[in-house]
C-alpha cells in the first residue's frame, strides 16, 4: 500500500478564506440559464472522488460570509497521480451548447520544496454524455476530454503573507449535445489545486418586443457561428407589414441580431411604445400604413375610439374616389351671371363660376335644354337633335354653344354646376336658367330632286322648294362629282330657279348630284344623293340622222352653229378671266387636269373652298369669317408691320363674353381694291380652318376703317426667332412635341385639300404653352426683306430654301411639296432657328439639291429625326411620307423617348451631307491651323494644339463633348466648329468612295 503524501490542506483553505473577503460575486447575466452552480449549494456537494483519498470537499466563506463548498487536492510529493472528481448527473434541458465556468487557485510548484519532479500546475476537464444517472461508478474510458486547464496565475507562500489573492477563472464550452444530460469530471495529475466554484450554464435569447412583434425565449444554436431565425408574433391590434414578416436571429451569445420586417398598428390604432392604442374620438387612422392617428378632416367626425374613417356631417359628402384624409364636401351653388347670345337658331351661353364650389376643385357644368310653349306653360326636353359645342355635360369651361334649334321657338336652358358629390346629394338642384326665343333658321333639306333629261354631256334636274324655307331662298347650290372619283374633287353650280342643266360632263359616266338651298340665314342641308349616268358616245346612226336634218334645214344648222360658236367664245373669255384672277397665287398652278371649284376628300372631312370661286370676294369673306363690330376691338400697341399695313396687339370683347387677347392686322390707308381683295383673301382662307395647331380667325372688320383681320394672339411670336432667342434651352422631347404639333396642323390642312406653299419656321407661331400653330395663308407678299430669300420664275416668287425641287422647276405645288418644306422646318427646329443652307446662294442651293445633296443633321439631332428629314426630301414626291405618317412617326418617338437617344451614324441607309462649290475643301488643308483660319475660328488654335489635335484626321473624329472640353463655351462657336467637322468627315468619306448621295 502506497501512502500518498500531501501538503496540509490548511495552506489552500486559508487562501480560499482570503479569497472570500477579496472577491466580489458577479451577478448572473440575463442571457444565461444555470444548470449547476456550486456556490449556490450550501450543503455538501457529494460529488464522487476516485480514489477517495484524492479530491476532498471542504467548506469556506464567500464575501457575504455565506458558507460555500469547494474541492481541493494537493498530492504533489508522489509521481503519476490520477485523482478524479465527478459531478452529479446534470440535465441539459433544451440546450445544445453548454458553457462550464471554473474558478480555482493553484500553488506555484517552485514555492514548494522537494516537489520539482512530481508537482504539476495543470489539471484536465472531461465530460460524459448520457440520458440518465449511471450511478457512482466512474468509468474513466467513457469520458471525453474537454481541455487541459492551466492557471494564469499561481500563488506562493509569500502571497499568503501579503494577502495577494490570485483566483483564476476559465470558461470552456461543450457541444453540440444530443443526450438528455451529462457528467463533468476533473482529473488531477499532481497539482496543488482548489476548485472554488463550478458553474454550468447555457445561453438563450430572452423574450423581447421589437417593432411591435413578440419574440419568445430562444435557445442559442449548437455552433458558435450559428444564428437561429425566429418569427415574431404581432402584439394586440397590430398586423404584419405586407410581404415583410417580423423576424430576428438569436446569436450564439444569446443576443438578438438582424431584425427583419415589422408589425404595424392596424387601421384605427397607433403605436405607443411597444403597444398599439386606439385612436381617440375625433381622430382616425384609415390605413395600417399611416403612422399616427389624424384629426378628422373638416366637416367630418368620429364618435368612437379606434375609428378607421370619419363620417361626414349632414349635408356634406365624400365621393367614392375621395381618400379618407380629404374634407367632406357638398355640391356647388348655382352658376352666376348667366348671359346668352342668339344667332338665328344657335345660342351661345356664358356664365361665371358658382360663388361656392362646395370645397372641391372638380366643378364641371351640364346643360339642360327645354322647349317651351308659352301659351300652355309646358316645357319638354329638347331631345337628341340638338347639338352642343363642345359638349352638354362634363363642361370644364364656362361657355357652351347650342346648335340646330328650331326657328322661332321658345327654349329654356338650365346651367347646373356639379362636382364629385353632386350625385350623392338628396338636396334640390341649384342651377341658373335663361329663356330665349330663336330667330330665323337656315332652310330645311331640298326634296323631290328628279332628272328631267339626260344626254351625253349634260343632265337636266328639277326639285321642290324646302318644306321649311325659313326665309327667302336666294339661290340653290348643286354639288356634283363622278361617282368613282368621290375621293378627289367635286364641282358646284349655283342657280336661282328650281331647275338647272349641268353641262360639260363626260359621256358614259355616273355622276352624283346633291342640292341645298341658301337664305340670309345660311345654307341648308344637302338633299339625298341622286346617281345619274350620262349617255354613251353617239353611234353611226345618230350621225346619219344629223346629216339628214342638216340637209333638210341648212339655215337652222348655220344659225345653231353660229350661236354655239358665240357661246363657246364667251365661255373661253370668261374662263380666262376667272383663271387670271387670283388670291395670293394663281390656282392654275394647282395640280389637276380640270379647273374645279373645290378640292374635297370624303368621307366626313371638312373641305377647303377656294375663295376664287366667288364672283364677289366680299361674299366669300362673309361666308367664312365673322363680321366684328369695330367698337369691340381695342388696339393696344403696334407689334410689327406687314405688306398691307401694321400688325397690332389688342383685346376683343364681344357682348356677353370674356375679352380675349388678339392680334390685329390692319389695311393701310389709300389701299386699292385689289389690295383690299388680297388682304381679305387670307381671312376667307383662315375662316375655314378649325384646328388646335392652325391659327384661329376671330373675325374681320370690313364695314369700317381701317379694315381689320382679327386672329388669336400668339405670345411667343414666330418660331424661328423664338428658337434663336432660347438656343439650347429645350429638351429633345420638347422640340419633337413642337414638330408634332406642326405636323398635325399640316395633316388637317392636307385633309381639307389645302396646299400651304410657304411652310417655314417663320410662318409658325408659338403661344405661351409652346403650342405651335400654322399661319400665313397668303403668298402674295414679300417673304423676307432679303432679296435672296426667293427665286423668281415665271408666275411669281418662290422661297427656294424651303421649296421642293418640282415646285421650283415646274411650279407643281402639292401636299407632297409641303412635306418637303416640313422637312426644312424640322431642320430649323432642331438647329434652333439656323438659316437653311447658311450663306449659300439660291442658285447653289438649287444645284446642290439637283445633285442629290441634302442638309446634314443639326448638332445633337437624333438619327431617327434626321432620317425623317431625309425621307421628306426624297426627290420623287410619291416616295415622301404623308403628314398622317409623319404624325404617327413622331407619336412613336414621343412614346418611346429612348429612340431619341440614338447616336448619329445609325441610320438605315448611308447619307451624304450637303456638299457644294461654296463649301471649302477641308481635305486640301495641310494643318489644323489652316482649317481653323478658313472657318474664322483661328482664336482656338492653341486650344486644339494643347489638347493634342495636331492632324485633320484626329479633328474629324471629334464629338461635341470633345469640342466643349477644349474650353470653347460659346454655343455659336461650338455649332460652327461641329458643323465644319461633320462636313470635313463627309468629304473624307466622299474622297474614299464611301459617300452616297440621297
UniProtKB/Swiss-Prot annotation:
The lineage of its organism: Eukaryota, Metazoa, Chordata, Craniata, Vertebrata. The active site is at residue 758. The keyword Ligase does not apply. It is a single-pass type I membrane protein. GO terms for biological process: axon guidance; brain development; branching morphogenesis of a nerve; ephrin receptor signaling pathway; modulation of chemical synaptic transmission; negative chemotaxis; negative regulation of collateral sprouting; negative regulation of phosphatidylinositol 3-kinase/protein kinase B signal transduction. InterPro entries: Eph_TM, EphA7_rcpt_lig-bd, Ephrin_rcpt_lig-bd_dom, Ephrin_rcpt_TKs, FN3_dom, FN3_sf, Galactose-bd-like_sf, Growth_fac_rcpt_cys_sf. GO terms for cellular component: dendrite; glutamatergic synapse; hippocampal mossy fiber to CA3 synapse; neuromuscular junction; neuronal cell body; plasma membrane; postsynaptic density membrane; postsynaptic membrane. Receptor tyrosine kinase which binds promiscuously GPI-anchored ephrin-A family ligands residing on adjacent cells, leading to contact-dependent bidirectional signaling into neighboring cells. The signaling pathway downstream of the receptor is referred to as forward signaling while the signaling pathway downstream of the ephrin ligand is referred to as reverse signaling. Among GPI-anchored ephrin-A ligands, EFNA5 is a cognate/functional ligand for EPHA7 and their interaction regulates brain development modulating cell-cell adhesion and repulsion. Heterotetramer upon binding of the ligand. The heterotetramer is composed of an ephrin dimer and a receptor dimer. Oligomerization is probably required to induce biological responses. Interacts (via PDZ-binding motif) with GRIP1 and PICK1 (via PDZ domain). It catalyses: L-tyrosyl-[protein] + ATP = O-phospho-L-tyrosyl-[protein] + ADP + H(+). The modification Phosphotyrosine is found at residues 608, 614, 791, 940. Glycans are attached at residues 343, 410. This is Ephrin type-A receptor 7. It comes from Rattus norvegicus (Rat). Residues 1-27 form the signal peptide. Belongs to the protein kinase superfamily. Tyr protein kinase family. Ephrin receptor subfamily. Residues 923-987 form the SAM domain. The chain crosses the membrane at residues 556-576. Its main location: membrane. Residues 32-210 form the Eph LBD domain. SMART domains: EPH_lbd, Ephrin_rec_like, FN3, SAM, TyrKc. The keyword Plastid does not apply. Residues 331-441, 442-537 form the Fibronectin type-III domain.
Amino acid at each position: 500500500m502506497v501512502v500518498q503524501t500531501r501538503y496540509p490542506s490548511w495552506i489552500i483553505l486559508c487562501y480560499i478564506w482570503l479569497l472570500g473577503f477579496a472577491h466580489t460575486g458577479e451577478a448572473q447575466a440575463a442571457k444565461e440559464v444555470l444548470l449547476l452552480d456550486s456556490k449556490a449549494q450550501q450543503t455538501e456537494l457529494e460529488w464522487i472522488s476516485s480514489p477517495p483519498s484524492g479530491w476532498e470537499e471542504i467548506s469556506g466563506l464567500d464575501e457575504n460570509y455565506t458558507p460555500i463548498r469547494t474541492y481541493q487536492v494537493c498530492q504533489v510529493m508522489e509521481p503519476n497521480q490520477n485523482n478524479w472528481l465527478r459531478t452529479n448527473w446534470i440535465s441539459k434541458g433544451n440546450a445544445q451548447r453548454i458553457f462550464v465556468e471554473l474558478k480555482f487557485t493553484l500553488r506555484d510548484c517552485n514555492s514548494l520544496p522537494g516537489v520539482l519532479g512530481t508537482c504539476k500546475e495543470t489539471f484536465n476537464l472531461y465530460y460524459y454524455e448520457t440520458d440518465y444517472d449511471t450511478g457512482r461508478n466512474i468509468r474513466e474510458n467513457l469520458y471525453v476530454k474537454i481541455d487541459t486547464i492551466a492557471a494564469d496565475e499561481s500563488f506562493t507562500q509569500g502571497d499568503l503573507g501579503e494577502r495577494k489573492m490570485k483566483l483564476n477563472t476559465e470558461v470552456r464550452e461543450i457541444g453540440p449535445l444530443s443526450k438528455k444530460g451529462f457528467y463533468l469530471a476533473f482529473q488531477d495529475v499532481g497539482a496543488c489545486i482548489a476548485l472554488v466554484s463550478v458553474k454550468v450554464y447555457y445561453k438563450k435569447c430572452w423574450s423581447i418586443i421589437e417593432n411591435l412583434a413578440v419574440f419568445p425565449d430562444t435557445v442559442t444554436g449548437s455552433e458558435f457561428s450559428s444564428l437561429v431565425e425566429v418569427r415574431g408574433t404581432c402584439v394586440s391590434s397590430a398586423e404584419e407589414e405586407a410581404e415583410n414578416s417580423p423576424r430576428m436571429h438569436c446569436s450564439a451569445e444569446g443576443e438578438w441580431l438582424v431584425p427583419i420586417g415589422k408589425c404595424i398598428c392596424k387601421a384605427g390604432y397607433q403605436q405607443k411604445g411597444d403597444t398599439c392604442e386606439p385612436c381617440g374620438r375625433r381622430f382616425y387612422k384609415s390605413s395600417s400604413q399611416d403612422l399616427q392617428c389624424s384629426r378628422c378632416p373638416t366637416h367630418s367626425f368620429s364618435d368612437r375610439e379606434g375609428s378607421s374613417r370619419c363620417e361626414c356631417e349632414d349635408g356634406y359628402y365624400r365621393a367614392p374616389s375621395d381618400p379618407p384624409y380629404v374634407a367632406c364636401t357638398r355640391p356647388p351653388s348655382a352658376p352666376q351671371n348667366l348671359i346668352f347670345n342668339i344667332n338665328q337658331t344657335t345660342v351661345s351661353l356664358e356664365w361665371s363660376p358658382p360663388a361656392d364650389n362646395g370645397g372641391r376643385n372638380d366643378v364641371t357644368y351640364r346643360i339642360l335644354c327645354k322647349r317651351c310653349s308659352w301659351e300652355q306653360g309646358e316645357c319638354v326636353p329638347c331631345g337628341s337633335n340638338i347639338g352642343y359645342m363642345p359638349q352638354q355635360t362634363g363642361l370644364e369651361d364656362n361657355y357652351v354653344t347650342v346648335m340646330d334649334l328650331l326657328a322661332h321657338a321658345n327654349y329654356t336652358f338650365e346651367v347646373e354646376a356639379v362636382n364629385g358629390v353632386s350625385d350623392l346629394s338628396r338636396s334640390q338642384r341649384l342651377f341658373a336658367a335663361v329663356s330665349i326665343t330663336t330667330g330665323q333658321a337656315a332652310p330645311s333639306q331640298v326634296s323631290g330632286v328628279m332628272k328631267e333629261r339626260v344626254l351625253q354631256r349634260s343632265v337636266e334636274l328639277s326639285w321642290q322648294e324646302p318644306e321649311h324655307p325659313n326665309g327667302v331662298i336666294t339661290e340653290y347650290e348643286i354639288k356634283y362629282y363622278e361617282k368613282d372619283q368621290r375621293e378627289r374633287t367635286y364641282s358646284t353650280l349655283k342657280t336661282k330657279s328650281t331647275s338647272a342643266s349641268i353641262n360639260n360632263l363626260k359621256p358614259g359616266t355616273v355622276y352624283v348630284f346633291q342640292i341645298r338651298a341658301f337664305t340670309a340665314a345660311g345654307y341648308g342641308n344637302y338633299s339625298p344623293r341622286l346617281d345619274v349616268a350620262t349617255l354613251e358616245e353617239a353611234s353611226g346612226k345618230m350621225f346619219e340622222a344629223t346629216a339628214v336634218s342638216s340637209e333638210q334645214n341648212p339655215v337652222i344648222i348655220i344659225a345653231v352653229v353660229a350661236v354655239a360658236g358665240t357661246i363657246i367664245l364667251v365661255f373661253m373669255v370668261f374662263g380666262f378671266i376667272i383663271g387670271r384672277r387670283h388670291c395670293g397665287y394663281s390656282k392654275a398652278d394647282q395640280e389637276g387636269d380640270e379647273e374645279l371649284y373645290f378640292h374635297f376628300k370624303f368621307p366626313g372631312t371638312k373641305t377647303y373652298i377656294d375663295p376664287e370661286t366667288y364672283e364677289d370676294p366680299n361674299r366669300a369673306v362673309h361666308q367664312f369669317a365673322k363680321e366684328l363690330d369695330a367698337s369691340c376691338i381695342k388696339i393696344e400697341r403696334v407689334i410689327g408691320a406687314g405688306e398691307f399695313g401694321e400688325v397690332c396687339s389688342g383685346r376683343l370683347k364681344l357682348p356677353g363674353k370674356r375679352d380675349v387677347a388678339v392680334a390685329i392686322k390692319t389695311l393701310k390707308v389709300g389701299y386699292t381694291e385689289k389690295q383690299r381683295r388680297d388682304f381679305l383673301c387670307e381671312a376667307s382662307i383662315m375662316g375655314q380652318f378649325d384646328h388646335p395647331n392652325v391659327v384661329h380667325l376671330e373675325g374681320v372688320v370690313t364695314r369700317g376703317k381701317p379694315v381689320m383681320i382679327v386672329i388669336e394672339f400668339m405670345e411667343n411670336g414666330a418660331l424661328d426667332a423664338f428658337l434663336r432667342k432660347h438656343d439650347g434651352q429645350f429638351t429633345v422631347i420638347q422640340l419633337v412635341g413642337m414638330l408634332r404639333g406642326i405636323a398635325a396642323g399640316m395633316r388637317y390642312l392636307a385633309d381639307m385639300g389645302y396646299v400651304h406653299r410657304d411652310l417655314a419656321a417663320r410662318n409658325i407661331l408659338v403661344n405661351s404653352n409652346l403650342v405651335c400653330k400654322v399661319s400665313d395663308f397668303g403668298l402674295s407678299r414679300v417673304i423676307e426683306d432679303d432679296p435672296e430669300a426667293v427665286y423668281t420664275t415665271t408666275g411669281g416668287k418662290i422661297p427656294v430654301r424651303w421649296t421642293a425641287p418640282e415646285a421650283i422647276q415646274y411650279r407643281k405645288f402639292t401636299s407632297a411639296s409641303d412635306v418637303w418644306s416640313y422637312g426644312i422646318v424640322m431642320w430649323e427646329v432642331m438647329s434652333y432657328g439656323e438659316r437653311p443652307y447658311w450663306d449659300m446662294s439660291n442658285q447653289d442651293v438649287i444645284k446642290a439639291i439637283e445633285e442629290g445633296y441634302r442638309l446634314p443633321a443639326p448638332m445633337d439631332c437624333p438619327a431617327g429625326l434626321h432620317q425623317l428629314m431625309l425621307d421628306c426630301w426624297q426627290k420623287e414626291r410619291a416616295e415622301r411620307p404623308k403628314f398622317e405618317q409623319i404624325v404617327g412617326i413622331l407619336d412613336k418617338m414621343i412614346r418611346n423617348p429612348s429612340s431619341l437617344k440614338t447616336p448619329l451614324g445609325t441610320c438605315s441607309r448611308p447619307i451624304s451631307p450637303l456638299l457644294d462649290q461654296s463649301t471649302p475643301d477641308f481635305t486640301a488643308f495641310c494643318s489644323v491651323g489652316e482649317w481653323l483660319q478658313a472657318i474664322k475660328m483661328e482664336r482656338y488654335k492653341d486650344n486644339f494644339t494643347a489638347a493634342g489635335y495636331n492632324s485633320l484626321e484626329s479633328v474629324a473624329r471629334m464629338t461635341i463633348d470633345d469640342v466643349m472640353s477644349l474650353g470653347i463655351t460659346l454655343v455659336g462657336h461650338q455649332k460652327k466648329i461641329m458643323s465644319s467637322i461633320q462636313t470635313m468627315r463627309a468629304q473624307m468619306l466622299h474622297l474614299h468612295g464611301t459617300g452616297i448621295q440621297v
